[in-house]
C-alpha cells in the first residue's frame, strides 16, 4: 500500500495527513510512504514525520540526484520516483545507491517538466518520451537486480 503525502494531499491538509500517518497502525512491511520532493519544506517535514513511525520504505517524489538522498536516515529503504528528465537521466545512479530498493517513473509529471500537456497520444498510447523513460527506468532497475 502506498500512503501518499505528495500529490494526493492538498497543501492545506499536509499537517493533518502527517498526523494521520503517525497515528496509523498499518503493517510497516506492506506500506510505502510517498514523500514530497527533495528541496521542499514538505520533504523535510515528511522525513521528520516518518522518523516517528515504524514505516521504513520511502518513495521520493521527483527524485533527480542521489545527493538528494543524503538526509534520508540509513534505516530507510528508498524507492526513487523518476518524474523529470533529470531524474530519468539518473536512473542508473539511483539503482546503484545503497538504500534504493526500487525505481518508479511518472509519465504526467515527466511530460509536464518538459513543457508538455499530456503523456498520451489521442489513441491512448504513451508518447515516445514517456515510453523511453519507462524503458530506461526498467532497464536501470533490471540491471541492478
Predicted regions and their residues:
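Expand to "…catalyze enediolate/carbanion chemistry for C-C bond making/breaking, isomerization
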Residues: 1-145
